[in-house]
């Protein structure tokens, strides 16, 4: 089957934003203008196409990035038909892992900002992730019709808060109630959209007299940014020659792809204005899969670096970036194809696990509908049905050309909750449900507490776990009781020690003998967490028992001696020991190592570590004192304060997670609902003695 759309006309883009910037409405309008949805879904009434999971509709926030395919030929049908694969990314801080995952498979992104709220804390997190994956991006300032909307303030905030280089290519005509359209700085005409057909058609008009001077100024700013693309253009510009529209667009595109500038547009998705021009900018300024460098990876057989070009001629390679459970077809695995072609029914290699997978069926997703397709090619984003054992972030590739594409990094969960099924019947269903959900979401973990036998789920925040429990109920019919949220503490050591243990048993029959001497020392926080170094000389412990020593210690790490929490940041050197020809066994050395480790930890000045969160609170000035006082009471360290640009203050602090439970309710009541906050995990640091004592007491009690 030949390719329907040339790969140069593909745009794989993400729509990314802070939680209330109107991203879902923006995505919804994109789907409407690109001809997919006939009735505009409004988030206000819970009907948006991309928010296809029930809880998202209830909470009015986007949780799962749905991948949707649509087509666009330009506002004035001036382009050949382009194929957009749009990935909707969540804006809530508990779902940063989703954003990270979608950034990995995007070629370009549209950052949506609120014209009133501007650059929010979460916008900064998303920006950092886009930088990490070097994603070229445009900015779209939405909600220009709202009270307090100010496009130029957002331009300034992007410079100061994101250290971005925004280049407006349109400016607004009016603001708030009087927002009517935009001035296109390339054509130096105003664009007025037709309200009768929801903005599907438009007319060019003259620039309103009061805006001519401002438009001239911003056009010069844009041309200057374009001229910096090459010496040739700069000479032309400095020589006073006019640059043609094609030259300006080409130069802006070149600099956008290089990450040097971020073209900026504005509008009001809700009022059907501006999204259409932004879609044209996606075509003009964001990359096709062929514009970005070949995807990098490693050959699992040789461990050498390898790469794949975005071409059908190359061997097949794809990344599984999302799992979804569908009640009709079971597991859907969303894949981004980087190279080659694969057909339904083909067998491919999961290079991370070294297993073979048969691709049952392939489907193209349009928000909640799906179309069966026969094959996928380089640049495509689609969902595969029938994969048995594939987890998020794994690579699928041709067996004849194995490659592991870059591993995604997922944060460690910071909060635990115990869940108990309400009935015996729920018990089994709960196990299945939790395993499925953990497969979909690598930042969510499930384990059984050895002492209490309870099932413990861990995640990135209270909302994250609430949604997991909610999904168990809706999708799997599991009713569960949940405990109070618990903090994921860790333990470590503060000084270097030497420890020894001899495990010897002689009681008739075969005895047991294992003897180890280890040196323990603290490691840099935030690194590998555990390192084992074999320094045995002269065979005092035979080779075959060395891995058993490592295993004995690894198996002991999850339960530290302070309060039974996992031990991190410790380096172990195995320096000496002895063995018995007959009685030594792997088990004996495991037991000896485990006891030596516990012994060593007691002497090594053990400490309890607690997760510290980076917290940002935006509050009206009159509540400033209360907010600061409250953060101090919560053992917070206030790092700084800024004006938020709309008459309020933004407080940055680091606060232990243990003190943040229920914070949203307290903040609401202290500020009459006018303050907002966001937090994300920052680091682990040593808990003060009185806190450590209380935690230890509670664990023992």
UniProtKB/Swiss-Prot annotation:
GO terms for molecular function: GTP binding; GTPase activity; guanosine tetraphosphate binding; translation elongation factor activity. SMART domains: EFG_C, EFG_IV. It is found in: Cytoplasm. Keywords: Cytoplasm, Elongation factor, GTP-binding, Nucleotide-binding, Protein biosynthesis. PROSITE patterns: G_TR_1, G_TR_2. NCBIfam families: EF-G (TIGR00484), PRK12740.1-5 (NF009381), small_GTP (TIGR00231). Residues 8-290 form the tr-type G domain. CDD domains: EF-G, EFG_III, EFG_mtEFG1_IV, EFG_mtEFG_C, EFG_mtEFG_II. This is Elongation factor G. GTP binds at residues 17-24, 88-92, 142-145. It holds the Pfam family EFG_C. Belongs to the TRAFAC class translation factor GTPase superfamily. Classic translation factor GTPase family. EF-G/EF-2 subfamily. One of its GO terms (biological process) is ribosome disassembly. Its main location: cytoplasm. GO terms for cellular component: cytoplasm. Catalyzes the GTP-dependent ribosomal translocation step during translation elongation. During this step, the ribosome changes from the pre-translocational (PRE) to the post-translocational (POST) state as the newly formed A-site-bound peptidyl-tRNA and P-site-bound deacylated tRNA move to the P and E sites, respectively. Catalyzes the coordinated movement of the two tRNA molecules, the mRNA and conformational changes in the ribosome.
């Amino acid at each position: 089957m030949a390719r329907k759309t040339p790969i140069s006309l593909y745009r794989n883009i993400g729509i990314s934003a802070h939680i209330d910037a109107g991203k879902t409405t923006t995505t919804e309008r994109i789907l409407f203008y690109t001809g997919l949805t006939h009735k505009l879904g409004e988030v206000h009434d819970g009907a948006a196409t991309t928010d296809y999971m029930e809880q998202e509709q209830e909470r009015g926030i986007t949780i799962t990035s749905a991948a949707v395919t649509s087509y666009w030929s330009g506002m004035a049908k001036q382009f050949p038909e382009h194929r957009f694969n749009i990935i909707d990314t969540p804006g809530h801080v508990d779902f940063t892992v989703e954003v990270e995952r979608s950034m990995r498979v995007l070629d370009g992104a549209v950052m949506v900002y609120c014209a009133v709220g501007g650059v929010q804390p979460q916008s900064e997190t998303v920006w950092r992730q886009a930088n990490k994956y070097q994603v070229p991006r445009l900015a779209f300032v939405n909600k220009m019709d709202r009270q307090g909307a100010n496009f130029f303030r957002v331009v300034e905030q992007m410079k100061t808060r994101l250290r971005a280089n925004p280049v407006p290519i349109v400016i607004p005509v009016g603001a708030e109630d009087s927002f009517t359209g935009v001035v296109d700085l390339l054509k130096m005409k105003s664009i007025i959209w037709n309200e009768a057909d929801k903005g599907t058609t438009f007319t060019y008009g003259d620039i309103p007299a009061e805006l001519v001077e401002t438009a001239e100024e911003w056009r010069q700013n844009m041309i200057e940014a374009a001229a910096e693309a090459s010496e040739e253009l700069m000479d032309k510009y400095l020589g006073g020659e006019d640059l043609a529209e094609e030259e300006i667009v080409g130069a802006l595109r070149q600099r956008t792809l290089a990450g040097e500038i971020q073209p900026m547009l504005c509008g009001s998705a809700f009022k059907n204005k501006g999204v259409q021009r932004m879609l044209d900018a996606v075509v003009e300024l964001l990359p096709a899969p062929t514009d970005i460098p070949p995807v990098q990876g490693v050959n699992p057989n040789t461990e050498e670096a390898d790469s794949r070009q975005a071409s059908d001629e190359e061997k097949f390679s794809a990344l599984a970036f999302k799992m979804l459970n569908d009640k009709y077809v079971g597991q859907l695995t969303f894949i981004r194809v980087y190279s080659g072609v694969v057909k339904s029914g083909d067998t491919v290699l999961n290079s991370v696990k070294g297993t073979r997978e048969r691709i049952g069926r392939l489907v193209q997703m349009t928000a909640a509908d799906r179309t069966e397709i026969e094959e996928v090619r380089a640049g495509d984003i689609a969902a595969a049905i029938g994969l048995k054992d594939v987890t998020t972030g794994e690579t699928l590739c041709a067996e004849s050309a194995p490659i592991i594409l870059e591993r995604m990094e997922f944060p460690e969960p910071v909060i635990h909750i115990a869940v108990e099924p309400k009935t015996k019947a729920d018990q089994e269903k709960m196990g299945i449900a939790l395993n499925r959900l953990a497969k979909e979401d690598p930042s969510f973990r499930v384990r059984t507490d050895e002492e209490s036998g309870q099932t413990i789920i861990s995640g990135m925040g209270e909302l994250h776990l609430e949604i997991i429990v909610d999904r168990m109920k809706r999708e799997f019919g599991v009713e569960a009781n949940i405990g109070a949220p618990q903090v994921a503490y860790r333990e470590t050591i503060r000084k270097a020690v030497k420890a020894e243990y001899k495990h010897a048993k002689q009681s008739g029959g075969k005895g047991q003998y294992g003897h180890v001497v280890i040196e323990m020392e603290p490691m840099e926080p935030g690194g590998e967490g555990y390192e084992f170094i074999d320094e045995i000389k002269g065979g005092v412990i035979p080779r075959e028992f060395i891995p058993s020593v490592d295993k004995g210690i690894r198996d002991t790490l999850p339960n530290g001696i302070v309060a039974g929490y996992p031990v991190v940041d410790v380096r172990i050197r195995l320096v000496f020991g002895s063995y018995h020809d007959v009685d030594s066994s792997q088990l004996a050395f495991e037991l000896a190592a485990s006891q030596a480790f516990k012994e060593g930890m007691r002497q090594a000045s053990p400490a309890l570590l607690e997760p510290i969160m980076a917290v940002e609170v935006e509050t009206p000035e009159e509540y400033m004192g209360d907010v600061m006082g409250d953060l101090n009471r919560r053992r917070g360290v206030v790092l700084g304060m800024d004006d938020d640009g709309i008459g309020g203050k933004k407080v940055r602090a680091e606060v232990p997670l243990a003190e943040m439970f229920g914070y949203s309710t307290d903040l609401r009541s202290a500020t009459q609902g006018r303050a907002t906050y966001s937090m994300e995990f920052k680091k682990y640091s040593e808990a003060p003695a009185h806190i450590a004592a209380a935690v230890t007491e509670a664990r023992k009690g």
